[in-house]
Amino acid sequence: MTTETRSLYSQLPAIDRLLRDSSFLSLRDTYGHTRVVELLRQMLDEAREVIRDSQTLPAWCENWAQEVDARLTKEAQSALRPVINLTGTVLHTNLGRALQAEAAVEAVAQAMRSPVTLEYDLDDAGRGHRDRALAQLLCRITGAEDACIVNNNAAAVLLMLAATASGKEVVVSRGELVEIGGAFRIPDVMRQAGCTLHEVGTTNRTHANDYRQAVNENTALLMKVHTSNYSIQGFTKAIDEAELVALGKELDVPVVTDLGSGSLVDLSQYGLPKEPMPQELIAAGVSLVSFSGDKLLGGPQAGIIVGKKEMIARLQSHPLKRALRADKMTLAALEATLRLYLHPEALSEKLPTLRLLTRSAEVIQIQAQRLQAPLAAHYGAEFAVQVMPCLSQIGSGSLPVDRLPSAALTFTPHDGRGSHLESLAARWRELPVPVIGRIYDGRLWLDLRCLEDEQRFLEMLLK
């Protein structure tokens, strides 16, 4: 060991001496003595490795307390960090889908702080059913006889099939054998549920007679799957639920539908493309309809099944129901969200998903113009900051073809180098509240459709 190396090792402080420093008092109070000591030992080992490999001290050796604070602050950050979603996708699966209404947030907080009547009947002091209150709400909204709630729509489809068709055949159009994110495929779910898939028709055309010819003594269900995340256009043919229900009654086979996104209001009244609604399918005579809670409905992640009382009873008594049931926080948020639908005149104000989807392009354009000047002043040396028209999408497999006119702030590097865009996007992801946009066509786009808190946005980007 050289004299220089020995000198560097001698400059490493003892842990006891560091802990006596006043700058470590607040760190020990915040993070605990044990964790601070563990990190200091780790940092000393790192410093020794740097000395051994490069004959120098790490730069942070000049201020140990500052480095410890920085590392422990980063370590303490939640894995679920709030972000500003400016991707242009309103229901972004990777960013948690639907924002919750204030009523839902308050309901969850109350359910977490206190014991609640999850499965307790106050009238007779006996055991209640956790789905009962929500089932009543869902029946009121959809016109169904009963309802069942599980933890997501994939679970709803699995339970629906396992409880009503295990060991039997389920007839589905070939054009409706969907795959959604995470490799969730209808044929795979059927196998897990113990069903045999009997596909009929072709990818683009399926007729009533295709279903009729497929039905046999082992047929349990006729199934419709709403192709919410893709669209088949051109020379196509599909029969709707009402026609399939009529055929099912003739052949004594119930009809079930996986609706996917599931909107409880007619979106066309807000100028949005119309999606099929559970209440329409119930009115048409479908026995069971499943849909998501955290997509167009605007609530928490949940799988909702509405339909005929006898069919729902089979789901409730199936062993999978307990494995897939929703917890009290989910039920609290979902109940609060559903209650908003009882007052439809205020829905577009109180339900964040609908509020964001219905923002007009003109309003967003004005917002973009208001924000352009301070951002151009801050970033103008490196980037041209412009207001550009763009198209938002709903996301989460909802209305895949339709786009919503919007406006964006775009950042274009003066030197045209894409690496500068990547660097800027990375810097924004490292902010205390990360700002998430998208890089496209030589620009970094910030679609402002989902931006409601302008002050926080500017605080982050003008740092």
Swiss-Prot record:
Enzyme Commission designation: 2.9.1.1
Full protein name: L-seryl-tRNA(Sec) selenium transferase
Subunit description: Homodecamer; pentamer of dimers. Binds only one seryl-tRNA(Sec) per dimer.
Keyword Cytoplasm assigned: yes
Domain of life: Bacteria
Pathway noted in the entry: Aminoacyl-tRNA biosynthesis; selenocysteinyl-tRNA(Sec) biosynthesis; selenocysteinyl-tRNA(Sec) from L-seryl-tRNA(Sec) (bacterial route): step 1/1
Family membership noted in the UniProt record: Belongs to the SelA family.
Gene that this polypeptide is encoded by: selA
Gene Ontology molecular function terms on file: L-seryl-tRNA(Sec) selenium transferase activity
Pfam families: Se-cys_synth_N, SelA
InterPro entries cross-referenced by the UniProt entry: PyrdxlP-dep_Trfase, PyrdxlP-dep_Trfase_major, SelA-like, SelA_trans, SelA_trans_N_dom
Keywords assigned by UniProt, alphabetized: Cytoplasm, Protein biosynthesis, Pyridoxal phosphate, Selenium, Transferase
Residues recorded with modification N6-(pyridoxal phosphate)lysine: K295
PANTHER family: L-SERYL-TRNA(SEC) SELENIUM TRANSFERASE
Enzymatic reactions: L-seryl-tRNA(Sec) + selenophosphate + H(+) = L-selenocysteinyl-tRNA(Sec) + phosphate
Translocase is among the record's keywords: no
Function of the molecule: Converts seryl-tRNA(Sec) to selenocysteinyl-tRNA(Sec) required for selenoprotein biosynthesis.
Residues passing through the membrane, by range: none
Subcellular location: Cytoplasm
Cofactor needs: pyridoxal 5'-phosphate
GO BP term (any one): selenocysteine incorporation
GO cellular component labels: cytoplasm
